[in-house]
Amino acid sequence: MPELPEVEVVRRGLQDHVVGKTMTAVRVHHPRAVRRHEAGPADLTARLLGARISGTDRRGKYLWLTLDAGAPTTGRDDPDTALVVHLGMSGQMLLGGVPRAEHVRISAVLDDGTVLSFADQRTFGGWQLADLVSVDGSVVPAPVAHLARDPLDPLFDVDSVIKVLRGKHSEIKRQLLDQQVVSGIGNIYADEALWRAKVHGARVAATLTRRQLGAVLDAAADVMREALAKGGTSFDSLYVNVNGQSGYFDRSLDAYGREGEHCRRCGAVMRREKFMNRSSFYCPRCQPRPRR
């Protein structure tokens, strides 16, 4: 599943290419792609027709396009709304041609002739329209309001998150994956952050010191910034930017996917274990398991 860096790469591409443009035609090719929009496909297409894209934003793994209220071509007087995009496991926001047309679930034609397509092979992602609401000093779509801030958010408060983690009596990795504690971190970057901080993912969050928790959160922010600079992590053709190009941070991973390889820090053989129906990768020497 795309995590924060991959979603931010897509957002930046959309910011550069679609802001200021108006949707002149919209077609839903697969109803599952708009299942989160409770009013249905016809309502979504009608409300998007003539809508002007005024900006882009993101929180965690969700991104959205801000739409001008009451687009002049429609005469509507809607409240400020956003087109919320969740990429799911394999969603892509593509401009221009698409390599596999059969995977296109939604398409929108912009006023300059550009086609914006939502392709999704596994159909876990989708689009929905939502009102923008004010939450904790930020304006976000209502379906995103429950998410915590992510480590790259300018208003992310490390001390406040540490305080929350100090009260959690479950594994630190479980907490990193909880989007209501800190958003944007998935399995890949959780393993990378824990490796950098020399903390085993099975350690109970409440037993870690403030310094250790701070190190984990700082490492998460650092590794995601580095991944963002390299276009994100792409293990296959499913994770691409708006131009269909893959990222290459997978070549720089220190923990994830490196079972049986030597730790780049101490030389021990990296291990893999099951955790929450996922795989966790760690160094047994740098990140010793907690005692039972």
Curated annotation (Swiss-Prot):
Reactions this protein catalyses: Hydrolysis of DNA containing ring-opened 7-methylguanine residues, releasing 2,6-diamino-4-hydroxy-5-(N-methyl)formamidopyrimidine; 2'-deoxyribonucleotide-(2'-deoxyribose 5'-phosphate)-2'-deoxyribonucleotide-DNA = a 3'-end 2'-deoxyribonucleotide-(2,3-dehydro-2,3-deoxyribose 5'-phosphate)-DNA + a 5'-end 5'-phospho-2'-deoxyribonucleoside-DNA + H(+)
UniProt entry keywords in alphabetical sequence: DNA damage, DNA repair, DNA-binding, Glycosidase, Hydrolase, Lyase, Metal-binding, Multifunctional enzyme, Zinc, Zinc-finger
Residue spans, zinc finger FPG-type: 254-288
Where are the catalytic residues? 2 (schiff-base intermediate with dna), 3 (proton donor), 61 (proton donor), 278 (proton donor)
* Names of required cofactors: Zn(2+)
Q: GO MF annotations for this entry?
A: 8-oxo-7,8-dihydroguanine DNA N-glycosylase activity; class I DNA-(apurinic or apyrimidinic site) endonuclease activity; damaged DNA binding; zinc ion binding
Question: What is this enzyme's EC?
Answer: 3.2.2.23, 4.2.99.18
Which biological process terms from the Gene Ontology are attached to this UniProt entry?
base-excision repair
Query: Which Gene3D superfamilies does the record cross-reference, listed alphabetically?
Result: 1.10.8.50, MutM-like, N-terminal (3.20.190.10)
> What family is this protein classified in?
Belongs to the FPG family.
Q: How does it assemble?
A: Monomer.
Spell out the protein name for this chain. Formamidopyrimidine-DNA glycosylase
Gene expressing this chain:
mutM
